[in-house]
């Protein structure tokens, strides 16, 4: 059995869509919950924090070479999600009278759902309308709405519904009419929408009453991350690499089944497997699962970030002794409490929170549109974006607009929820 066949078998069951009400975030280990609660209280009492600066500084420490990262990190998974969408769309019935004939899938940063919807639509021959420009949304999008009346028997795919409205007094009319048109024509439709926009549009337009049912990717807990990251790291395991925690020397990642003994996919050298016992791993990936909210795109961003920590000086002597049996190089991972992820400046940061909330509601925006929809000056927006990029929670999108980064999403989510913003499901 070759490695590609093994990997295909192991992927089965990873990418499952569940009803939104069935989505459950992985539980945070008890000790971590207490630790984070105390740290959050301390940051609020101090009124300032330098963790963001520390996180940015640690980004440039011991970066793994790109050729090794390709053997360690998961690749695109939108094809697996597209297959799940095809399975689902054949089983979901109409949402009922007065509802859109279709269903919605909620998205999160880096989860590949938008790409999966596009891929499925291309294979099925469904049209995918391009996002409207801000000026078209504000003007009502008449030409687009008229086009929906053509070929109504052909299903429609909308990967990013949040790109069809603006939080502006003239920015909701188009989306209202779009939903009305879909209901009246009965045109089959598959919609993707980020979870923050969905919560906002459900409150402001009642979209959850006309576009249902709603699905989400089943949360990735620690064991599911073990499977996913383990299968992705087949190349690294075959090259003799091991993943160990820098304080104890215990494994963080166990070899995927396809490179275990007798599989025909290579040899396993992990201690314990040779004795027929399960490989003992730390709870590092349980922490990643909980902190990422079970979102795969966020989890893989954290995993990549954590693999940058490789200072030998930070490796305990007992850990180095444990690694002496490794037949190849050891990739050291810091214990979870010592991983410094991006964070926001502590205290009330109203301009920063307004910018972040706008980005989450719309997926991504450029500075010009931010000035249209926010009660902030252009100078405040530019300065705020510079601060957020420096913190590592905002990044430039391929089209030059701005978006919340997958790595920074948990910190942004925590901050906005803490300030009472209407938050998404994740």
Go through each PLM region and give its residues:
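Short, amphipathic alpha-helical interaction segments positioned at domain boundaries
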Residues: 408-426
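Minor-groove-contacting beta-hairpin "wing" of winged helix-turn-helix DNA-binding domains
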Residues: 400-406
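Short amphipathic alpha-helical interaction segments
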Residues: 375-391, 396
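Conserved P-loop NTPase "ATPase switch" module shared by AAA+ and STAND
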Residues: 130-174, 192
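P-loop NTPase Walker A phosphate-binding motif
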Residues: 85-97, 107-127
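Winged-helix-like regulatory helical subdomains adjacent to P-loop NTPase cores
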Residues: 297, 301-380
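The catalytic "switch" region of P-loop NTPases
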Residues: 175-283, 290-291, 305, 312
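A short, basic N-terminal segment
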Residues: 1-99, 422-426
């Amino acid at each position: 059995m070759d490695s590609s066949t093994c990997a295909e078998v192991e992927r089965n069951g990873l990418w499952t869509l569940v009803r939104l009400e069935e989505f459950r975030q992985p539980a945070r280990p008890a000790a971590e919950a207490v630790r984070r609660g105390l740290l959050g209280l301390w940051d609020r009492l101090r009124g300032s924090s330098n963790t963001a600066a520390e996180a940015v500084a640690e980004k440039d420490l011991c970066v793994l070479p790109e050729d090794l990262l390709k053997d360690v990190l998961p690749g695109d998974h939108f094809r697996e999600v597209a297959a799940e969408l095809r399975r689902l769309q054949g089983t979901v019935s109409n949402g009922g009278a007065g509802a859109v004939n279709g269903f919605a899938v909620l998205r999160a940063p880096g989860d590949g759902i938008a790409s999966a919807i596009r891929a499925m639509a291309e294979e099925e021959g469904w049209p995918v309308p391009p996002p409207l420009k801000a000026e078209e949304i504000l003007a009502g999008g008449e030409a687009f709405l008229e086009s929906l009346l053509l070929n109504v028997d052909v299903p429609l795919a909308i990967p990013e519904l949040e790109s069809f409205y603006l939080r502006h007094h003239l920015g909701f009319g188009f989306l209202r009419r779009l939903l009305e048109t879909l209901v009246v024509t009965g045109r089959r439709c598959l919609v993707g929408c980020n979870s923050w926009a969905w919560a906002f549009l459900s409150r402001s337009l009642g979209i959850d009453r006309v576009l249902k049912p709603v699905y989400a990717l089943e949360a990735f807990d620690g064991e599911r991350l073990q499977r996913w990251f383990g299968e992705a790291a087949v190349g690294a395991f075959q090259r003799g690499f091991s993943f160990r925690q820098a304080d104890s020397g215990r494994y963080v990642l166990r070899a995927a089944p396809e490179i275990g003994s007798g599989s025909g996919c290579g040899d396993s050298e992990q201690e314990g497997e040779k004795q027929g016992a399960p490989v003992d791993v730390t709870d590092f990936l349980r922490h990643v699962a909980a902190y990422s909210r079970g979102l795969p795109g966020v989890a893989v961003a954290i995993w990549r970030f954590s693999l940058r920590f490789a200072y030998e000086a930070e490796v305990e002597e007992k850990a180095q002794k444990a690694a002496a049996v490794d037949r190849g190089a050891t990739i050291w991972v810091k214990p979870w409490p010592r991983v410094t992820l991006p964070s926001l400046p502590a205290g009330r940061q109203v301009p920063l929170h307004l910018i972040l909330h706008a980005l989450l509601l719309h997926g991504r925006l450029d500075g010009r549109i931010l000035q249209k929809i926010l009660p902030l000056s252009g100078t405040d927006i530019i300065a705020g974006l510079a601060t957020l990029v420096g913190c590592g929670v905002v990044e430039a999108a391929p089209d030059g607009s701005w978006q919340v980064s997958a790595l920074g999403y948990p910190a942004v989510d925590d901050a906005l929820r803490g300030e009472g913003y209407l938050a998404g499901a994740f």
